[in-house]
Amino acid sequence: MPRPDTMRAMILPEFGAPLRPATVPVPKLGPNDVLLRVRATGVGLTVVIMTRVPGRVTSFPRIPGHEVAGEVVELGSEVAHVKVGDRVTCHFYLTCGVCHFCRSGRETLCPASPGNVGMACDGAYAEYMTIPARNVVAIPAGVSDVDAAIAADAIATPYHACREEARVGPGDLVLIVGAGGGVGIHAVQMAKLAGGWVLAADITDDKLAAVRDSGADELIDVRRGDLAAQVSKLTAGRGVDAAIDFVASKETLEGSLGSLARAGRLVIIGSRPTAAFGVDSSFVVDPRHVLGSMLEIHGSRYVTLTEIAQTLELLRQGRIRAVVSRTFPLEGAEEAHELLRRNALVGRAALVLS
């Protein structure tokens, strides 16, 4: 199929504006890039936040979208390890590839990073996109485009958080706050896969039902009262070994920290910036409590390339299930964003391109 000159895309014309459909040129390849024909792209809070928080997007207009499944249709002149026809997803941090952090599996801390796919460069809300070849990860046969599209963030992110930060092991009691969202619902599955006993907290009936279906052992309706008190009751006063907070509001962070058992780990993985959601994320930590109970507080920032590949393999084996509750055509992106802003989506949404 010959390369077209133009493509359909959803663009963010300026800061704070709604997305709008547009016909734009197909992006040009750099020598180390690949051109993807986009098959599906995930819709998550990261994309919604970039439209409302100043400084995330480097220039306008911008094509959003950082979760992608696509087919390689063209290679840059220096690309050798990827083939035309490969199905791939991508690591969405743009990095130098040579600094201490990039070479030690901590790409997300690269000091030379210009930003993220869909913010510092155009993303996957389009029929075609370019991406540095070093960012792509092969999609195994048997994993659908929609599942693969969300895997690189919504599933891989909690894989890293549960394994490396929370260090969930057999018998651990694990609290997951914001468990019914696009990342939290997969954290429930990851914690169960690691042998944890999962207490899943959220604020709507449909999300609590969904996390039960995803394997949660105990449900906590945060509307019914103090989070830490509910955890204490469910654990007979023991507390949890790990708390993973995908909301990161003042209330949930205080509740998560207050829910920890001795030697417990609090993992902060999500955020809902005030500019986008009106959420206050500041909270006070008493160092005497942290010291006396030997607590740990971790920030968990995305994943490595290897962890994306491992997550895709878990999907291929059927050990993890991708939870995509709604799919939309490309032009339905703004509708999907509005559902996210209203906290009305269970699990993830995806845009599917024909």
Model regions and ranges:
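Short N-terminal strand-loop motif that marks the start
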Residues: M1-A69, I131, V352-S354
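Mid-domain Rossmann-like dinucleotide-binding core that forms the NAD(H)/NADP(H) cofactor-binding site
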Residues: A141-G225, A229
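Glycine-rich phosphate-binding loop and adjacent beta-alpha segment
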Residues: A194, I203, K250-R321, V352-S354
